[in-house]
Every structure is written in structure tokens, then in C-alpha cells.
Swiss-Prot record:
GO MF annotation, one: protein serine/threonine phosphatase activity
Signal peptide: none
GO cellular component: cytoplasm; nucleus
Keyword Secreted: no
Organism annotation: Xenopus laevis (African clawed frog)
Protein name (database record): Dual specificity protein phosphatase 1-B
Gene Ontology terms: biological process: endoderm formation; meiotic cell cycle; negative regulation of MAPK cascade; negative regulation of meiotic cell cycle; negative regulation of p38MAPK cascade; peptidyl-serine dephosphorylation; peptidyl-threonine dephosphorylation; peptidyl-tyrosine dephosphorylation
Length: 369
């Protein structure tokens, strides 16, 4: 139940607020991660509430779920924001919202403890505001892959002079694709094209293979993840390490290119794990996001199972251990440890390939890429 009056804010009033006192305004976008990533209001933050979190919260959501950014949450608690503005796609009346909608849950959480900030919802949502005030919005259309000559013949820095455009595999055509402004995905061939990497501003590469060479170690920073594209491979044990590496390059203002042999299975899996962890989204949403940028991605069935298990960790609410929560042993590259998962249906993160056969996945995958 909302404990204080939530006022509607017209787009013209919101425009004036952004123009004059943007630093005193916290903008919370309650649309999906996919919609937010495609286009959003400059300076806004995305509110992402998983189905698991919604179900367990039973309508009582904590601020840590609504505002995961600690700095923003701290500023709100300290009363440093004059206004908190929430928006979704097109809502014009708050009464039109379902009680379990992301925006209504956010409104309820904020209204219980506003800390001196007035709470508003943007009338007409992003759809209306972006059409009336496009200058205050970022529009990030799915990027087109870099177009450079496919033949590496006579290209300075090329590591392979035996390929020709004739018969070039689909996964080697075009160039690396942008997943995020600092994260790119492609194949081993793309990783051998120094001209492509430099044109994109790549500063580091993650090589997700056991046999693809690191061609330019004196020029780029490399991280190797020696995983085979097989149903027995444990790629999930590398997720956190890969995510930390990407974040470290991002923090330094660099860009990371993730590749395997074809840029279809192993490297796509790492990119999916990164999106799921850092943006707190489900696998199917991350998969759709990446597939729109590189349509041929298809992690093998075992990798999809490991991503589903990773999803259960990423989206599980962080709370104290509860009775009935299973204690399970996981194998971390040969080291046996015990982990307690708080969500009752958690399953081993590093199960062998044989134990993944029961997992039902709606996304079509290929056996190997």
C-alpha cells in the first residue's frame, strides 16, 4: 500500500527539472533491461526486479532491490535528492498499474521511507517523453558490425594470410559486434585482425579457448580461459573471473573483445553471464539482447544449463539463510567447497554434464559450435 501521495509529473515539467536541477533528481526507469538498454533518459537508472525477487518479497520490496547502486541509495537515504521520478513505457495514471508491476513495487518501497524526497511518476512514460524531448534521451540502436575487407591478405598486423573472402564462414563475416560500449563479441578470425581491433578501440581480449593463439600480446592485454566447447566443460567456474576482468578494463576506460573459435558458443556464454550478473537479468532476456546483435550465437546445451544455474544465483535475493535451504557441494576447478544457497530450489553450480540432462530450456541450442 502506498503511504503518501504520488504525484504525476508532465513531460514539460520534467524537462525543466532536468535542465535546471538534474543533479537533485533521481530517475528510475522501470522498463525492461532490453528496452532500457536500447533507449533511455540521460542519467536514469534501470529498476530490475526478477520474478523470484517479486515472489519472495510479497509486495514489500527493500530499497536495495529498487536502487542497487550504493552511491545513489546513500544519496537518497541522506536526503540529497529533491525528487524521485519513476517511469515505465507509457503509463498515464498510477491506478492503471498492476500491484505486482515493477513501477508499483518501486513506488511502494520508496513511499514507505521517502527521506524528504518528493516522489513522482512521469505521465505518459518514456514513450511520450522521448517523442517530446528527444534531446534528453540516449538512443542506442543495435550496432552494425564493423565493415572491413574480409581478406586478411596484405593487411598489416594480420596473423593469417591464408583466408580469402570466397567461402568465408558466416561467423567470420563482418566484424566484432558491440554488446555494450565496452564489450565486443566475435570469432578467432576477428581476433587475428589487428586493424579491426584498433578501429574499435579494443584494449583487451578474452580468449575463451584452449587452442586459439593470442596474436598481439605486446599490443593488447589478454586473458585466457582454456575451455573446450564440449558438454563436459565447466565454463561456469570462470564466470566471476571473466566478469571481474571485464569490469577492470571498463573501469580503466578500455574495451574488451571476447572471442572463441567461432564466436558462437563459448565466448557468447561469457557475454551472457556478464549481462546477467551486472544487470541482474534472466538468461532469456540476456540471450535476446545478445542475439539481436550477433544472430548466430548458440551456446551448447551444457553451457545453457550452467547459465540457468548461474541465473538462480544472480537473481536469488541476498538474505539470511533460511530453514530448508539446501547445503550443496560444488567443485571449483578441483577444489571441493561447500556453499549454502538461500533460495530453496538452488542446484549445484558446477554439476557434471550428465546431471544437466533434465534441465528444460526454451531457447534452441546447438550441440556444439
Amino acid at each position: 500500500m502506498v503511504n503518501m501521495e504520488i504525484c504525476a509529473m508532465d513531460c514539460c515539467v520534467f524537462k525543466g527539472l532536468l535542465a535546471e536541477r538534474a543533479h537533485k533528481c533521481l530517475i528510475l526507469d522501470c522498463r525492461s533491461f532490453f528496452a532500457f538498454s536500447s533507449s533511455s533518459i540521460i542519467g536514469s537508472s534501470n529498476v530490475r526486479l526478477s520474478t523470484i525477487v517479486k515472489r519472495r518479497a510479497k509486495g514489500s520490496m527493500g530499497l536495495e532491490h529498487i536502487i542497487p547502486n550504493e552511491e545513489q541509495r546513500g544519496r537518497l537515504v541522506a536526503g540529497m535528492y529533491e525528487a524521485v521520478v519513476l517511469l515505465d513505457e507509457r503509463t498515464s495514471e498510477l491506478d492503471m498499474l498492476r500491484k505486482d508491476s515493477t513501477m508499483m513495487l518501486a513506488v511502494n518501497a520508496l513511499s514507505r521511507d521517502p527521506r524528504g524526497s518528493r516522489i513522482y511518476f512521469l505521465k505518459g512514460g518514456y514513450e511520450t517523453f522521448s517523442s517530446q524531448c528527444p534531446e534528453f534521451c540516449n538512443k542506442n540502436s543495435p550496432p552494425v558490425a564493423l565493415s572491413l575487407p574480409l581478406s586478411p591478405n596484405n593487411v598489416p598486423g594480420s596473423a593469417d594470410s591464408n583466408c580469402t573472402p570466397c567461402g568465408t564462414p558466416l561467423y567470420d563475416q563482418g566484424g566484432p559486434v558491440e554488446i555494450l560500449p565496452f564489450l565486443y563479441l566475435g570469432s578467432a578470425y576477428h581476433a587475428s585482425r589487428k586493424d579491426m581491433l584498433e578501429a574499435l578501440g579494443i584494449t583487451a581480449l578474452i580468449n575463451v579457448s584452449a587452442n586459439c593463439p593470442n596474436h598481439f600480446e605486446g599490443h593488447f592485454q589478454y586473458k585466457s580461459i582454456p575451455v573446450e566447447d564440449s558438454h563436459k566443460a565447466d565454463i561456469s567456474s570462470w564466470f566471476n573471473e571473466a566478469i571481474d576482468f571485464i569490469d577492470s578494463i571498463k573501469t580503466c576506460g578500455g574495451r574488451v573483445f571476447v572471442h572463441c573459435q567461432a564466436g558462437i558458443s563459448r565466448s557468447a556464454t561469457i557475454c551472457l553471464a556478464y549481462l546477467m550478473r551486472t544487470n541482474r537479468v534472466k538468461l532469456d532476456e540476456a540471450f535476446e539482447f545478445v542475439k539481436q546483435r550477433r544472430s548466430i550465437i548458440s551456446p551448447n546445451f551444457s553451457f545453457m544449463g550452467q547459465l540457468l544455474q548461474f541465473e538462480s544465483q544472480v537473481l536469488a535475493p541476498s538474505c539470511s539463510a533460511e530453514a530448508g535451504s539446501p547445503t550443496i557441494s560444488v567443485l571449483d576447478r578441483g577444489t571441493s567447497t561447500t556453499t549454502v544457497f538461500n533460495f530453496p530450489v538452488s542446484i549445484p553450480v558446477h554439476s557434471g554434464a550428465n546431471s544437466l540432462s533434465y534441465l528444460q530450456n526454451p531457447i534452441t541450442t546447438s550441440p556444439s559450435c
